[in-house]
Amino acid sequence: MAIVANTFTSFDAKGIRESLANVIANISPDEVPLQSNIGSESVSNTFFEWQTDSLASVDKTAVIDGDDVTSFDSTAATVRIGNYTHISRRTLIVADNLNAQDLAGRNDEKAYQMAKRGRELRRDIEAVLTDNNARAAGNSSTARETAGLGAWIATNTNKAGDGTDPTANDGSDARNDGTQRDLTEAMVKDVMQQAFTSGGNPSILMVGPHNKTVVSGFAGIAAQRYMAPSDSPTTIIGAADVYMSDFGTLQVVPNRFQRERDAWLLDPEYASVCYLRPINSVDLAKTGDADKAMMLAEYGLKVSNEAAHGGVFDLNVT
């Protein structure tokens, strides 16, 4: 049906205000499972150290009645190990005239962008801590680097035939990746048994998104069903968030920022993020018609005793 001639419509009008929602939708992931589950502490040097120790092997030798002590057990010294701090930062520069304008979804552009940088920085830190990266002392032209999980876990592992564990298990060298293969329940059981034998009690199985779905399909996980009344919606459970092994219960945690090819079995009590400088915002010198700032943190990974943890490595990523 045609409109009456000379009807003035919204297609002709020039003064209609735009309709822009006062909400900004951002679903970028920012969960950081490793940082959320392990502790944090402060350090006072770019190289921070700690000590590890272990008990002597079990001795079943019987002692004769009234026997004198003529020899003594050997005493092993503690092992001193350490890691370097790692500086991560995010920067921004925002023109001054932005705050003179009517902005949708935020009142202050710089504050909004700084909040974003903080979330981005936490994601960066998560990727560094879970990486297969050896520690580096750095110098005036090369940045220091902290050793990630991949450079620490060496005692309790399951890897491909051509993969190798870090030789020093002190963060000074990274593992060598091998041929990728499918994650299986037997691999997880193997590492849990190794950790138990070593004295560890991992409670978290941290995997990438693909291998989270693989864990949910383990044959050892019993099918779960709810009774479905005819007049109610039915819930179908297709995921595993807890895995009960012969040597303890594991909380299955997906991590978007770790390497998909690694599966970590962790005891949160034996790892922490050490901060020389915690995450903080710094306003930079103003040199023009704009505000400059950065969000910065200096931190390192402390693995109190790597034998408390384990890993399944060289996994397929799709």
Give the residues covered by each predicted segment:
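Flexible, glycine/threonine- and acidic-rich loop/arm segments that mediate assembly and lattice contacts
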Residues: M1-T318
